[in-house]
Amino acid sequence: MTFDENISRILVTDKEYDMPFSKGLLARSLSAAGMKPSESYTLAREIERDLNEQNVLKISKDELRRRVYYTLINRDYEGIGEKYLLWRRVLKKHSIIILVGGSSGVGTSTIAFELASRLGIPSVIGTDSIREVMRRSISKDLVPMLYESSYTAWTALRRSPWDEQDTKEMHLLGFERHVEPVLLGIESIIDRSLTEGTSVILEGTHIVPGLMGEKYHSMPNVIFLNLTLSSEETHKKRFTARAKVSDRPLERYLENFEIIKEINQYIVEKSKENNVPVIENVSISETVQKCLEIVTERFSNLNDEPIIDSDIY
């Protein structure tokens, strides 16, 4: 079968552009609304089959949305149907900023990309890349902690000879000094996204509730999520898995594991102080589902219209 034969002959029309019907795109939307991935793809395939049997060659996004909604209602998926419409509306009308924080190795990048896929958000930015940009504009002499890892930044602190050297307080102070300049870049991206009306997911160690500007915590479309791992064994296994697919040396993480644990606990405490959800990231699928539930709840606060009257696909 050629590539062209895989493209649906059904055209979905919109005010701005037309595109072929996509089972994958619809299945992703249904999955984000809470349907199991296998069920969502099956339903998307059935909807495409029904359209083909009815010889529908062109359908508006609005009509397709209604068909999907009523199909869900008829299959006793009323809750998923309402979420499906809610997500389509909110993502169309509002820029959504999702911030996924957590210490090294807890899985922020994996969860961020999963959320982006489910939500159809095209941009995922890791805070490590923001740190690299900040390094180009801030000299090492000015902020040496920025040029260290989050868990070794304390070694670059300027200390008096009589200061205690290797303590939890020093580790966390170094971490804070490492994070502060990166937060400037993070906040700039958030501000620009809000101004331009674009959605983005940012992920990484540098997203620390309480250290970021207070205004972001009160914005309904800026959503903070914090990931954690309580099990040392699981956390270490994540580093082992990471080392197999990247150039990051496992030994460096394990040598500094106690400091990474301290940073993890610090971020968790900061999250709780600022009413940010803390999610145990043992199972990727369960974590993604929990994150989607939290995001959906926030979406409900952004929704100010009757669902069925929406003209959004």
Swiss-Prot record:
**Signal sequence: where?**
none
- Give the top-rank taxon of the lineage listed in the UniProt record for this protein: Archaea
Q: Name one GO molecular function term.
A: kinase activity
Enzyme Commission (EC) number = 2.7.2.16
Per the UniProt record, the lineage of the source organism begins with: Archaea, Methanobacteriati, Methanobacteriota, Methanomada group, Methanococci
Task: Report the pathway entry.
Answer: Thermoadapter biosynthesis; cyclic 2,3-diphosphoglycerate biosynthesis; cyclic 2,3-diphosphoglycerate from 2-phospho-D-glycerate: step 1/2
Q: What class of enzyme is it?
A: transferase
InterPro entries cross-referenced by the UniProt entry:
2PKG, ATP-cone_dom, P-loop_NTPase
Query: Which co-factor is required?
Result: a divalent metal cation
Annotated organism of origin: Methanococcus maripaludis (strain C6 / ATCC BAA-1332)
Role of this protein: Catalyzes the phosphorylation of 2-phosphoglycerate to 2,3-diphosphoglycerate. Involved in the biosynthesis of cyclic 2,3-bisphosphoglycerate, a thermoprotectant.
One Pfam family of this chain: ATP-cone
The Swiss-Prot or TrEMBL record describes its family as follows: Belongs to the 2-phosphoglycerate kinase family.
Q: Does the keyword Iron apply?
A: no
Q: Which reaction does it catalyse?
A: (2R)-2-phosphoglycerate + ATP = (2R)-2,3-bisphosphoglycerate + ADP + H(+)
Provide the protein name: 2-phosphoglycerate kinase
Q: What are the entry keywords? A: ATP-binding, Kinase, Nucleotide-binding, Transferase
Q: Where is the ATP-cone domain?
A: 8-95
KW Nuclease (keyword) present: no
Query: What gene is this protein a product of?
Result: pgk2
